[in-house]
Swiss-Prot record:
It comes from the Eukaryota. Is associated with a DNA binding complex to bind to the G box, a well-characterized cis-acting DNA regulatory element found in plant genes. Belongs to the 14-3-3 family. This is 14-3-3-like protein. It comes from Populus euphratica (Euphrates poplar).
C-alpha cells in the first residue's frame, strides 16, 4: 500500500501543475 501512496502523491503533484 505504501508504494501506491507514493505513486499517488507523484500523480497529485503532476495534476496540480
Amino acid at each position: 500500500l505504501a508504494e501506491q501512496a507514493e505513486r499517488y502523491e507523484e500523480m497529485v503533484e503532476f495534476m496540480e501543475k
